[in-house]
Amino acid sequence: MNIKDALALVVNGKDLSVEQMTDVMREVMTGKATDAQRGAFLVALRIKSETLDEITGAAKVMRELATKVVVNADNLVDTCGTGGDGANLFNVSTASAFVVAAAGGHVAKHGNRSVSSSTGSADVLEAAGVNLQMPADQVARAIETIGVGFMFAPAHHSAMKHAIGPRKELGLRTIFNMLGPMTNPAGVKNQVIGVFTKALCRPMAEVLGRLGSEHVLVVHSEDGLDELSIAAPSHVAEYHKGNVTEYTLSPADVGIEMQSLEGLGVATAEESLALINGAFAGSDEPAAQKAAAIIALNAGAAIYVSGLATSFKDGVAMAEDALATGAAREKLKELVEFSAL
């Protein structure tokens, strides 16, 4: 199916099959469609609401066209979010990656520069001194030897260049906001994904199950974060062993004290890095203590889905240990040094 035929269906409220969506996305991602067609298609899909089949088909094409990172490691996991929650918190999922590595996991962190927030994962890692342009084989070695590596999305999804213009000009959330976390170049099968609305939790968990994932938590907090929050309960859709289970999780359920988010907002990558460094150093500043708590909560989730812990609560305890010993700080230092080689 070509994009013109697909547009005719979608604008009339008709859904596309997985096969039809893969045909159209290949036109979008290979430059065959015009900017006008790409923009119209993205908006029409958004207005109609994307179905599981459409999201699945689009994700398949992005995965197919990605520059792969082949990693030989157990417990491979990713921590990421869709962004777009408007909270402007420091980079929680990025910080969590180093804690998971310090606990013995292997994190294939996939991310980009900021689109809607103050700072994206790439921005804060660059501020820390990480070389974002590492080739795929070096990223794989980092994951295997250090336990964490960063895959800069534009370097691995070059086909995205065909969608950048329309996305920027539209200024709207589109299907691409969902696709980023579902198209990890290392093919991770265990993930913690934060989303900007509760309505996405179950659909994304179901799509990832269709795409071969093993253990996934898709989360959205009641105070609006695309993370697990320390200030409110969070909605969780957990995919594991072929089933999706939905539940509400309070920080206290896994041993984290409920507390406000005051002091965790940032305006720049440097401010985000300062909070992360404070948390990693065990600072007794109130903001650093809160940062450590929300990092431990989210890292604990990733440790759990990676298989390193048998329960979410045990994962959080392992994350707290990794922070307390300074091991997480060492992992960040190791990645900075390794990326400069």
Swiss-Prot record:
The UniProt annotation places anthranilate 2 binding at 167
Q: Which residue windows are coiled coil?
A: none
- Sorted UniProt keywords: Amino-acid biosynthesis, Aromatic amino acid biosynthesis, Glycosyltransferase, Magnesium, Metal-binding, Transferase, Tryptophan biosynthesis
Positions bound to 5-phospho-alpha-D-ribose 1-diphosphate: 81, 84-85, 91-94, 109-117, 121
Q: What Pfam families does the record tag this protein with? A: Glycos_trans_3N, Glycos_transf_3
Transmembrane residues, as ranges?
none
Q: Which Gene3D superfamilies match?
A: Nucleoside phosphorylase/phosphoribosyltransferase catalytic domain, Transferase, Pyrimidine Nucleoside Phosphorylase, Chain C
Provide the cofactor note recorded for this chain's UniProt entry: Binds 2 magnesium ions per monomer.
Give the InterPro entries listed for this entry. Anthranilate_Pribosyl_Tfrase (IPR005940), Glycosyl_Trfase_fam3 (IPR000312), Glycosyl_Trfase_fam3_N_dom (IPR017459), Glycosyl_Trfase_fam3_N_dom_sf (IPR036320), Nuc_phospho_transferase (IPR035902)
Q: How does it assemble?
A: Homodimer.
Record's PANTHER family?
Answer: ANTHRANILATE PHOSPHORIBOSYLTRANSFERASE
Descriptive protein name: Anthranilate phosphoribosyltransferase
| Originating gene | trpD
